[in-house]
Amino acid sequence: MNKIIIRKTEDLKEWRRNLKCDINFIPTMGNLHDGHQKLISTAQSSNCNTNLLSIFVNPLQFDSKEDLKSYPKTVDKDIEIAFSNGADAIFIPNVTDIYPKKNKSISYLKASKELSSALCGLTRVGHFDGVCTVVYRLLKLIQPKNLFLGEKDWQQLLIIKNLIEEKKFNIKIIPVPTQRDSDGVPFSSRNKHLSKSERKSLKLFSNELENAKIIFKKDKRIDLKQLTNKLKSKNISIEYLEHLHPYSLKKVQSNDNISILAGAIKCGKTRLIDHVFLMKRKPIIAIDGPAGSGKSTITKLIAKELNLLYLDTGAMYRAISWLFKKEKIDYAKESELKKILNNISIIFKSNSISQQDVFINNFCVTEEIRSQEISSIVSKISSIKKVREFLVYEQRKIGQSGGLVAEGRDIGTTVFPNAELKIFLTASIDERAKRRKSELDLRGTEEIDFNQLRELIRKRDFEDSTRKISPLKKANDAIELLTDGYSINEVVEKIVNIYNLNIPKEIQLE
């Protein structure tokens, strides 16, 4: 594809009409630095789409004419950087192209009040309205498939995400982690304004945020007042310093696992922002759903894709069911039940074929626990209070440090009610029976009629959803996905996309 520079909206529309593929869009205000280069190269390596970068200094985003006038403009250098890092086309409109004076139909938008009234919105009144207005205009003109945004401007990213949802644009946001210089300072177009002493102040600020993150990892708390006083003692001019929920931007609550420590400082006449994400533990994904909804297969693939531990809680219940059957345990007798539970050891080991083997008391039962014989008794055994208490305790112990994806029937409601992402996977009974039949036929271990399978699944659904202890039900904050008609890979991709929008990339890299 020939590299192209587009300056007029009419030319942009013509170029777009002639395209035979989707667009990856990287909006910028020019003065490109390493952070922008990462956005472009990420877009280029993500797919085979055309990569379009825009350079437009939006006047609606500036607090004063002086601030707008002083913004660095390096168009020739920007063009060179953009093309050398993977941009296929560059859109460089002027103000009248984006905001035609004679066009009275232009919508000047308001940013989400909830998201724009905190942090930068406290002093930069109207700034995010300007962001929403220009982004809306650009998205309507360009109609991209993907939008690449840096997490460095976290509040802006949230506001644009809200705009896309509100306007029902079919556009996927792909966040890119904050890029930092060798001294820990985040790349910013405004860094060029800094003197050596001002750069030193910014470095101190960024380093103190990083130190606070290290302390939080150990203590699970942060003393905002102490940190503020420490920064002031180093002559750092603080505009704001807040510890907030990363998505609502409201004051952090005691049960919030992930939070953001964000601040803005003044270095001379230059205003600069930085943040760090804080975690008490690594993220957890909880996947619940009825038998045959594809939980195990999908959860395994998600764990592999996101480099998370796969916790197959269903296999744990099946393993205990297998052991009870093997040892002929009378689980109606509490004394006998207590004795065997105190001596049970369940561990998972990776292998090259099924990815994970299940061992109970040193017996490898990976294949045995998937038999119809075990399927017919597992619901009854998993409804026993002592069994559930034992396994929930074991599961929570495994999940203490997070970094896992767990599947079962009560993960989001009972085991990990504070999981960062909860998915409720389901499918019609016919679809689930079809999948189960294919699975059994593939193994070639047992013959079973399709209609018989349908009735067994219907019976299992009733037992799971009506049991007194931890019944199968969707958590209030879970996202329900009906998987009929979707391939496994399509469902996995959908959940991974939801995860990427709900867990900052900067956290995923830790």
From Swiss-Prot:
Enzyme nomenclature, EC number: 6.3.2.1, 2.7.4.25
Binding residues annotated for (R)-pantoate, in chain numbering: 61, 156
Binding sites annotated in the UniProt record for ATP: 29-36, 150-153, 187-190
Classification via Pfam families: Cytidylate_kin (PF02224), Pantoate_ligase (PF02569)
This protein's pathway: Cofactor biosynthesis; (R)-pantothenate biosynthesis; (R)-pantothenate from (R)-pantoate and beta-alanine: step 1/1
Localisation per UniProt entry: Cytoplasm
Molecular function per GO: ATP binding; CMP kinase activity; dCMP kinase activity; pantoate-beta-alanine ligase activity
Keyword Aminoacyl-tRNA synthetase assigned: no
Tree of life domain: Bacteria
Matching InterPro entries: Cytidylate_kin, Cytidylate_kinase_dom, P-loop_NTPase, Pantoate_ligase, Pantoate_ligase/cytidylate_kin, Pantoate_ligase_C, Rossmann-like_a/b/a_fold
Protein name in UniProt: Bifunctional pantoate ligase/cytidylate kinase
Species this protein is from: Prochlorococcus marinus subsp. pastoris (strain CCMP1986 / NIES-2087 / MED4)
